Amino acid sequence: MEGPQIDRIKLGREGEEAAVRFLKKKRFKIVERGFRMLRGEIDIIAYDRKTLVFVEVKTRSRAGFGVPEESVTFSKQDQLRKIAQGYLVKNRLGDIPCRFDVVSVSIHDDGRPTIRHIENAF
């Protein structure tokens, strides 16, 4: 991997780190990051009080590509639901309140992030 691919990976990591800091400030308890199954990955799994929250982080460095959350398509939402279901089964969590949030991170030229948290995004 080199060039733009590495830049995208670095940008994604920066966005996830910014999202974790943001959620911790809001008193979320982070329980897992990068939960993977065959179908894909959930970026962050956390508790917001007694609700288990599956968080998709989307990061952009330029506004020309649109706002980050626009890339959470219906098919991506379906994929995240299936992965979340697998997480619940694997961890024997049964019938607990859950929701799906999106954290949108826009990285400015000076490296400063702007974060938008969309609770119950889908």
Predicted segments, located by residue:
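Short glycine/proline- and charge-enriched loop/turn segments
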Residues: 1-4, 60-65, 119
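Acidic-basic catalytic patches of nuclease active cores, encompassing PD-(D/E)XK
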Residues: 1-33
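Conserved catalytic cores of phosphodiester-cleaving nucleases, focusing on short active-site segments
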Residues: 23, 42-64, 80
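Hydrophobic "anchor" residues on beta-strands that sit immediately upstream
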Residues: 28-29, 52, 97
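Short acidic/glycine-enriched loop/turn segments that link adjacent beta-strands
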Residues: 37-40
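Mg2+/Mn2+-dependent nuclease catalytic core
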Residues: 61-81, 87-90
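Domain-level recognition of nuclease-like catalytic cores that cleave nucleotide substrates
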Residues: 90-122
